[in-house]
Amino acid sequence: MKRLVLIVCFMLMGATVMQAQSGLRVGANIGLPVGDMEEVSNFQAGVDLAYMLSVADMLYVGPMVGYTRFFMDEDNFGGFEVDDPAFLPIAASGRVALAEGFFFGTDLGYAVGLNDGNDGGFYYRPQAGYNFGKIGLIASYTGISVDGGSFGSINLGIEFGL
């Protein structure tokens, strides 16, 4: 009887961890610009919405859409007001769940430029995190490759499973 109770408990715990990865996820992140943007941008902020589906044991994929903005430092432009580059990333998202709530994954797609003269570019965001049930903490790198340069930031974020 004890063995049966233990087996059922472990099965329920595993189902809870697997269920925490799938479904609708809403996230927000802030980051420090790196690379081409390091000298001209103060910080980056973004939000995203993803729907993750379990396709195999501990493997999740789904569509993701978001909003990312790099806040420009006007002092570096002689005091002139400069539009903050903003993007609408549309991507495929994938994650691999590891033991004890840890996961890693990536988003790959295209970031649509939302400003005049901002044509957008290839979007990628590798990430690693830890899920506390319906809430997760994520460390990531956001990269957007555009003609003539790139936008990049190292981020820390939180996401909520709905």
Whereabouts are the PLM-identified features?
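Cleavable N-terminal export/targeting peptides
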Residues: 1-23
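Short glycine/proline- and aromatic-enriched beta-strand/turn motifs that initiate or cap beta-hairpins
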Residues: 19-61, 151-155, 159-161
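Residues that define the transmembrane beta-barrel architecture of outer-membrane proteins
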Residues: 22-24, 41-45, 84-88, 120-124, ...
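Repeated loop/turn-to-beta-strand initiation elements of outer-membrane beta-barrel proteins
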Residues: 23-24, 57-61, 101-104, 132-139
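Transmembrane beta-strands of outer-membrane beta-barrel pores
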Residues: 30-36, 65-71, 108-114, 132-134, ...
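Transmembrane beta-barrel domains of outer membrane proteins
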Residues: 50-52, 93-95, 127-131, 138, ...
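Helix-adjacent hinge/juxtasegments
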Residues: 67-104
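Mid-chain, well-packed structural core segment of small domains
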Residues: 97-118
